[in-house]
Amino acid sequence: MRAKHQEQPSLFGDTEPAQHVPRTNERPEAAAMMEVLRALRNHPAVAWCERQNSGAFRTETGQFVRFGWKGCADVIGQLRDGRFLAVEVKAPNGRLRPEQAAFLDQVRGAGGVGFVARNCADVARELASCIN
C-alpha cells in the first residue's frame, strides 16, 4: 500500500501551496502536467503560462489538420521580467526527444527560460536559478 502524500508547504511565500498530485501508472504525465501548471501559475515570477496542445485530427470532410509544431514545449508563457518561458513536462521516467531538447535550447539561446519539469520542486528549483 502506498503512503499518502501530504500537502507540501508553500514554496513561494504567501501563495497557495502547490500540492503533490498522486500519480497512477495510467497517466503519469497528465498528473505531472497538473502539478507543474499549478506551481507555475502560483510562482510570483510568472506573468502567465498556458498549456500548448499539439496533435492532429481529420475533419468531417476528410481533411487532415495538424496543430502545434514538433518539439514545442508543453507549457509556454512569460516571466514578469519579459522573458519567454518554455517548460517541457515529463513523467518521472520520461525522456526528452531530440526536437524537444532543440526547442528548449533555442529558447535559452534567445534569452528565454526553458527547462524540463516533472513536479513542483523542479519548477521552484529552475525558476530560482534564473531569477535574481
Which sequence ranges carry the predicted segments?
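Catalytic phosphate/metal-binding cores of nucleic-acid and nucleotide-processing enzymes, i.e., regions
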Residues: M1-N132
